[in-house]
Amino acid sequence: MIISAKFITSLVKFDENLSSNFSEVAFLGRSNVGKSSLINSLCKQKNLAKSSATPGKTQLINFFEVICKRNEEKFNINFIDLPGFGYAKVSKNLKEIWNQNLDEFLKLRTSIKLFIHLIDSRHTHLEIDVNLNDYLKRFLRPDQKILKVFTKCDKLNQSEKAKLKNEFKDSILVSNLNKFGLDSLEDIIINQTLGLDK
Protein backbone atom coordinates (compact mmCIF):
# COMPACT_ATOMS: atom_id res chain seq x y z
CA MET A 1 0.00 0.00 0.00
CA ILE A 2 1.02 3.61 -0.53
CA ILE A 3 1.67 5.25 2.83
CA SER A 4 3.08 8.66 1.87
CA ALA A 5 4.16 10.79 -1.06
CA LYS A 6 5.86 14.09 -1.72
CA PHE A 7 6.61 16.31 -4.69
CA ILE A 8 10.28 16.18 -5.76
CA THR A 9 10.70 18.52 -8.71
CA SER A 10 9.40 19.72 -12.07
CA LEU A 11 11.45 19.57 -15.24
CA VAL A 12 10.84 21.84 -18.20
CA LYS A 13 12.94 19.79 -20.60
CA PHE A 14 12.87 16.04 -21.02
CA ASP A 15 16.65 15.91 -21.34
CA GLU A 16 17.31 17.54 -17.97
CA ASN A 17 19.23 15.05 -15.88
CA LEU A 18 17.33 13.65 -12.93
CA SER A 19 18.73 10.28 -12.01
CA SER A 20 16.67 7.76 -10.10
CA ASN A 21 17.63 4.86 -7.89
CA PHE A 22 13.99 3.77 -7.69
CA SER A 23 11.58 2.07 -10.06
CA GLU A 24 9.28 4.57 -11.73
CA VAL A 25 5.69 4.73 -12.94
CA ALA A 26 4.88 7.07 -15.84
CA PHE A 27 1.36 8.48 -16.18
CA LEU A 28 0.38 9.35 -19.77
CA GLY A 29 -2.84 10.52 -21.35
CA ARG A 30 -4.77 13.23 -23.11
CA SER A 31 -5.13 16.62 -21.50
CA ASN A 32 -7.79 16.64 -18.77
CA VAL A 33 -8.14 12.85 -18.69
CA GLY A 34 -7.48 12.96 -14.95
CA LYS A 35 -3.77 12.17 -14.48
CA SER A 36 -3.17 14.61 -11.64
CA SER A 37 -6.44 13.67 -9.93
CA LEU A 38 -5.55 9.98 -10.10
CA ILE A 39 -2.12 10.57 -8.57
CA ASN A 40 -3.75 12.57 -5.77
CA SER A 41 -6.28 9.80 -5.14
CA LEU A 42 -3.65 7.05 -5.10
CA CYS A 43 -1.48 9.04 -2.69
CA LYS A 44 -4.48 10.15 -0.60
CA GLN A 45 -3.49 13.80 -0.89
CA LYS A 46 -5.83 16.43 -2.28
CA ASN A 47 -3.30 18.82 -3.82
CA LEU A 48 -0.12 16.78 -4.32
CA ALA A 49 -0.34 16.93 -8.12
CA LYS A 50 -1.68 20.18 -9.49
CA SER A 51 -4.31 19.86 -12.18
CA SER A 52 -5.12 22.59 -14.65
CA ALA A 53 -8.58 23.68 -15.76
CA THR A 54 -7.09 24.67 -19.12
CA PRO A 55 -6.43 21.68 -21.41
CA GLY A 56 -2.79 21.47 -22.47
CA LYS A 57 -1.61 24.14 -20.06
CA THR A 58 0.51 21.86 -17.88
CA GLN A 59 3.76 21.44 -19.80
CA LEU A 60 6.08 20.28 -17.03
CA ILE A 61 7.27 16.80 -16.10
CA ASN A 62 6.45 16.41 -12.43
CA PHE A 63 8.21 13.87 -10.20
CA PHE A 64 6.83 12.51 -6.94
CA GLU A 65 8.56 10.26 -4.42
CA VAL A 66 6.15 7.63 -3.15
CA ILE A 67 6.74 5.41 -0.12
CA CYS A 68 4.99 2.05 -0.21
CA LYS A 69 4.71 -0.86 2.19
CA ARG A 70 4.36 -4.55 1.41
CA ASN A 71 4.53 -7.29 4.05
CA GLU A 72 5.75 -4.73 6.60
CA GLU A 73 8.68 -3.71 4.37
CA LYS A 74 8.90 -0.15 3.07
CA PHE A 75 10.28 0.83 -0.33
CA ASN A 76 10.35 3.88 -2.58
CA ILE A 77 9.11 4.42 -6.11
CA ASN A 78 8.71 7.53 -8.24
CA PHE A 79 5.56 8.69 -10.01
CA ILE A 80 6.13 10.72 -13.19
CA ASP A 81 3.25 12.97 -14.26
CA LEU A 82 3.87 13.72 -17.94
CA PRO A 83 2.32 16.67 -19.82
CA GLY A 84 -1.10 15.94 -21.26
CA PHE A 85 -1.27 15.71 -25.02
CA GLY A 86 -3.88 16.50 -27.62
CA TYR A 87 -4.86 20.08 -26.78
CA ALA A 88 -1.62 22.00 -26.18
CA LYS A 89 -1.86 25.27 -28.09
CA VAL A 90 1.78 25.75 -29.00
CA SER A 91 3.66 26.35 -32.23
CA LYS A 92 4.24 23.41 -34.54
CA ASN A 93 8.00 23.76 -34.10
CA LEU A 94 7.76 23.66 -30.30
CA LYS A 95 5.41 20.67 -30.44
CA GLU A 96 7.93 18.79 -32.62
CA ILE A 97 10.69 19.51 -30.10
CA TRP A 98 8.46 18.25 -27.27
CA ASN A 99 7.68 15.06 -29.17
CA GLN A 100 11.33 14.38 -29.90
CA ASN A 101 12.38 15.00 -26.31
CA LEU A 102 9.50 12.91 -24.95
CA ASP A 103 10.43 10.10 -27.32
CA GLU A 104 14.01 10.04 -26.02
CA PHE A 105 12.89 10.35 -22.41
CA LEU A 106 10.49 7.39 -22.56
CA LYS A 107 12.83 5.15 -24.55
CA LEU A 108 16.01 5.83 -22.58
CA ARG A 109 14.71 6.11 -19.01
CA THR A 110 15.36 2.55 -17.90
CA SER A 111 13.95 3.12 -14.41
CA ILE A 112 10.38 3.27 -15.79
CA LYS A 113 8.75 -0.11 -15.10
CA LEU A 114 5.10 0.75 -15.70
CA PHE A 115 3.39 3.01 -18.23
CA ILE A 116 -0.10 3.92 -17.05
CA HIS A 117 -2.08 5.01 -20.11
CA LEU A 118 -5.14 6.93 -18.93
CA ILE A 119 -8.18 6.89 -21.21
CA ASP A 120 -11.55 8.58 -20.69
CA SER A 121 -14.01 5.71 -20.25
CA ARG A 122 -16.58 7.60 -22.35
CA HIS A 123 -14.21 7.94 -25.33
CA THR A 124 -12.32 4.68 -25.61
CA HIS A 125 -11.28 4.50 -29.28
CA LEU A 126 -9.82 7.91 -30.06
CA GLU A 127 -7.06 7.80 -32.64
CA ILE A 128 -4.66 9.66 -30.36
CA ASP A 129 -4.96 6.91 -27.71
CA VAL A 130 -4.60 4.09 -30.24
CA ASN A 131 -1.45 5.76 -31.59
CA LEU A 132 0.02 6.19 -28.11
CA ASN A 133 -0.54 2.54 -27.26
CA ASP A 134 1.06 1.39 -30.53
CA TYR A 135 3.97 3.75 -29.97
CA LEU A 136 4.70 2.43 -26.47
CA LYS A 137 4.56 -1.18 -27.65
CA ARG A 138 7.31 -0.53 -30.20
CA PHE A 139 10.03 -0.05 -27.57
CA LEU A 140 8.60 -1.86 -24.54
CA ARG A 141 11.24 -3.90 -22.69
CA PRO A 142 10.56 -7.28 -21.01
CA ASP A 143 10.69 -5.62 -17.57
CA GLN A 144 8.12 -2.99 -18.55
CA LYS A 145 4.35 -3.09 -18.80
CA ILE A 146 1.61 -0.90 -20.29
CA LEU A 147 -1.58 -0.67 -18.26
CA LYS A 148 -4.72 0.91 -19.69
CA VAL A 149 -6.62 2.75 -16.97
CA PHE A 150 -10.09 3.99 -17.87
CA THR A 151 -10.97 7.09 -15.87
CA LYS A 152 -14.29 8.69 -14.91
CA CYS A 153 -16.08 5.34 -14.85
CA ASP A 154 -18.63 6.79 -12.43
CA LYS A 155 -20.17 8.27 -15.59
CA LEU A 156 -20.96 4.75 -16.85
CA ASN A 157 -23.78 2.42 -15.87
CA GLN A 158 -23.11 -1.20 -14.87
CA SER A 159 -23.77 -2.53 -18.37
CA GLU A 160 -21.31 -0.06 -19.92
CA LYS A 161 -18.66 -0.95 -17.34
CA ALA A 162 -19.08 -4.66 -18.03
CA LYS A 163 -18.82 -4.11 -21.78
CA LEU A 164 -15.66 -2.03 -21.38
CA LYS A 165 -14.03 -4.57 -19.08
CA ASN A 166 -14.90 -7.39 -21.46
CA GLU A 167 -13.32 -5.55 -24.40
CA PHE A 168 -10.17 -4.54 -22.49
CA LYS A 169 -9.64 -7.52 -20.19
CA ASP A 170 -6.28 -6.47 -18.75
CA SER A 171 -7.39 -2.92 -17.99
CA ILE A 172 -8.48 -1.20 -14.80
CA LEU A 173 -11.57 0.99 -14.43
CA VAL A 174 -11.26 3.80 -11.90
CA SER A 175 -13.19 6.72 -10.52
CA ASN A 176 -11.54 9.47 -8.52
CA LEU A 177 -15.00 10.54 -7.38
CA ASN A 178 -16.00 7.35 -5.57
CA LYS A 179 -12.51 5.73 -5.36
CA PHE A 180 -13.62 2.76 -7.46
CA GLY A 181 -10.73 0.60 -8.69
CA LEU A 182 -7.97 2.43 -6.81
CA ASP A 183 -7.02 -0.52 -4.58
CA SER A 184 -6.61 -2.82 -7.59
CA LEU A 185 -4.51 -0.22 -9.39
CA GLU A 186 -2.33 0.27 -6.32
CA ASP A 187 -1.66 -3.49 -6.14
CA ILE A 188 -0.60 -3.61 -9.80
CA ILE A 189 1.72 -0.62 -9.35
CA ILE A 190 3.45 -2.20 -6.35
CA ASN A 191 3.77 -5.66 -7.92
CA GLN A 192 5.10 -4.32 -11.21
CA THR A 193 7.68 -2.00 -9.65
CA LEU A 194 8.89 -4.86 -7.43
CA GLY A 195 9.11 -7.21 -10.40
CA LEU A 196 6.40 -9.50 -9.04
CA ASP A 197 3.78 -8.97 -11.76
CA LYS A 198 4.88 -11.25 -14.59
Swiss-Prot record:
It holds the Pfam family MMR_HSR1. The keyword Metal-binding applies. GTP binds at residues 29-36, 56-60, 81-84, 151-154, 174-176. InterPro entries: G_ENGB_dom (IPR030393), GTP-bd (IPR006073), GTP-bd_ribosome_bio_YsxC (IPR019987), P-loop_NTPase (IPR027417), Small_GTP-bd (IPR005225). Mg(2+) binds at S36, T58. Residues 21-195 form the EngB-type G domain. Its cofactor is Mg(2+). Belongs to the TRAFAC class TrmE-Era-EngA-EngB-Septin-like GTPase superfamily. EngB GTPase family. Necessary for normal cell division and for the maintenance of normal septation. This is Probable GTP-binding protein EngB.
